[in-house]
């Protein structure tokens, strides 16, 4: 059996859509400027990026395309100050998503939706520093000019017990975002024989 390698087009698509998914997540994350909305950032990020991922899924025909995206996005979040845990977490969830897509032979909308749902747990990983380095995170917020009142309000809505619910909100946002993407792209998926 001949091993399929990535074409230049595959790599360009992976890079381009990684940046588009990251941009959609970044737009969703803007609600974080209002500290009481911080627990909902993973939900909004996944909801906003779901349609972009579903469009990307039409370009995925081999194992590794989601892993490339997860690696690029994890690196981008890591270098923008979201901690070191976001990269391995994003890569692990992207790898699990790869197996879900493969099980659906890269043609099943339902498998694609579940791939993105699982992957969207990663949108909560960018918040890990809030939970494990609280004091340092508060000081960083103050140093960046957000002020003590903003930091105190953020921490009041993100006590340690909220980590798992925040992760689950990311998955719910991913499921709904992928579903929204399916609805928006229904004609496109039918043309490709995926719907």
Stretch-by-stretch model annotation:
Residues 2-68:
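Hydrophobic transmembrane alpha-helices
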Residues 11-16, 43-44, 64-71, 87-88, ...:
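Hydrophobic alpha-helical transmembrane segments
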Residues 18-26, 72-80, 119-128:
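Aromatic-anchored segments of alpha-helical transmembrane domains
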